Amino acid sequence: MKKTTVINSELSTVIAGMGHMDWLSIGDAGMPVPMGTQKIDLALTKQLPSFQDVLKNVLSELAVQKIYLAEEIKTQNPEQLAAIQALLPDVEVAFVPHSQLKQDLAKTHAFVRTGEMTPFSNIILESGVTF
């Protein structure tokens, strides 16, 4: 049995297969996922698992050099923004319109759906390197 943090087989496979500058997205329960984008659905019920719980677990295994967030998170969910920034204090942040973030999901290796039910709790992680 795997000993590291992420034990979901689909998610673990995606993370292991990512190279430098590849994208992985994590989002709330309501985020629409484009056809053709792999969806790893972890949602069980409202807020379970939370966006933050999933993000923390993914970050334990994925090197991240840049993140993409919806511009709207600044005013519509500043608590979530602060929590994201606390987890990734030294990572470059690009803010884009929510409509653009939704379109960009088509470029990600996978979308991880959480049970999160707060607005604009969506992120695209750009993988870095460990050397």
From Swiss-Prot:
Residues reported in the UniProt entry to bind substrate: 28, 98, 120-122
InterPro entries: D-ribose_pyranase, RbsD-like_sf, RbsD_FucU
GO terms (BP aspect): D-ribose catabolic process
Keyword annotations from UniProtKB, A to Z: Carbohydrate metabolism, Cytoplasm, Isomerase
Catalytic activity: beta-D-ribopyranose = beta-D-ribofuranose
The protein's annotated pathway: Carbohydrate metabolism; D-ribose degradation; D-ribose 5-phosphate from beta-D-ribopyranose: step 1/2
GO MF entries: D-ribose pyranase activity; intramolecular lyase activity; monosaccharide binding
Keyword Isomerase: yes
Domain of life: Bacteria
A Pfam match: RbsD_FucU
Location of this chain's protein in the cell: Cytoplasm
EC number in record: 5.4.99.62
SUPFAM superfamilies: RbsD-like (SSF102546)
Cellular component per GO, a single term: cytosol
Keyword NAD: no
Active site residues per record: 20 (proton donor)
Membrane-spanning parts: none
Broad class of where this protein is predominantly found: cytoplasm
Enzyme class: isomerase
Family statement drawn from the similarity comment of this UniProt entry: Belongs to the RbsD / FucU family. RbsD subfamily.
Role noted for this protein: Catalyzes the interconversion of beta-pyran and beta-furan forms of D-ribose.
Assembly information from the UniProt record: Homodecamer.
HAMAP family given in the database record: D_rib_pyranase
Protein name per Swiss-Prot or TrEMBL: D-ribose pyranase
Biological source species: Levilactobacillus brevis (strain ATCC 367 / BCRC 12310 / CIP 105137 / JCM 1170 / LMG 11437 / NCIMB 947 / NCTC 947) (Lactobacillus brevis)
Gene coding for it: rbsD
